[in-house]
Amino acid sequence: MGNRTQQIAGIDKKDIMNRRLADNYWKKEELKLPDHYRMISAGAFQDNIRIERLLLGNRMEALGKDSFRHCIALREARLPHSVERLGEGCFADCPRLREAYMSQNLQAIPNSAFREDRRLEKILFTRDCDIFRIGKDAFSECVKLPAILLPRKVKEIDDRAFYRCKELKRVRFPEGLIRIGKEAFYFCGLESLELPESLEILDEKAFFKCTQLTEVCLPTHIRRIEKWVFHGCSRLKVLEIRHDPEYIGEWIINKAARIRCYRGSKVDMYCQESGFTVEYLE
């Protein structure tokens, strides 16, 4: 390498906290790093048993994959607004993590970021943050999470993003959301749905076994309703579809529910072919 400074993602090596350096902080309950650090490398603090709180400097830009995975004492993760990137699984499997505060400049919540954080109760985003995507399994099995207000710029909620979040009763979906992925809200506690008009794709089993839902009205720009979207929603009485999507998959509801639509529409034909009870709109 000669005298050339080593870099990772445009960051000098001397400004990266790696696993070897992290060992110097192994017994700290409050992690406060020197201000010059701009990145924490993959797995740097993984399996730490002491850290309870993070106090990261205002030059920190990136947290690597699994950087704080399975930090069993971690209770609060507060990211400075300088953080732009999180690695996959960065806060996964933290059994005592209760609160997480996201950075203003964060671009996305990566895959498995908070997966199986079973005591997570609060996830806060700044009003105008740049997050456009919630990754696969990002909050999967966060069983204590009661509500979430998604950032205004989110376009996609990827597969299993909130899988089996059993206490999740309220979600504010942003106008501009385009896709809700496969099993994104599988077996959640949602009591009602207000989906934005921008929504185009409801992927397979998106709201499977959301047993508290009783009535849902779909926005009129949805192009694809994949199979089993509301199947297993045992209390669902009515699914209202006021337009003709390009595609409707099989068994989108239970037989006990009914579909409210316009007489003679493609949705009406789908119901007749599938044996679903129909209620006609005036």
Descriptions of predicted regions:
Residues 18:
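Eukaryotic intrinsically disordered and solvent-exposed regulatory patches
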Residues 92, 114-115, 138-140, 163, ...:
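A structural signal for leucine-rich repeat
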Residues 21, 42-44, 64-67, 87-90, ...:
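Consensus positions within tandem repeat domains that build extended binding/scaffold surfaces
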Residues 1-15, 24-39, 49-62, 72-85, ...:
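Structural signature of tandem-repeat unit edges
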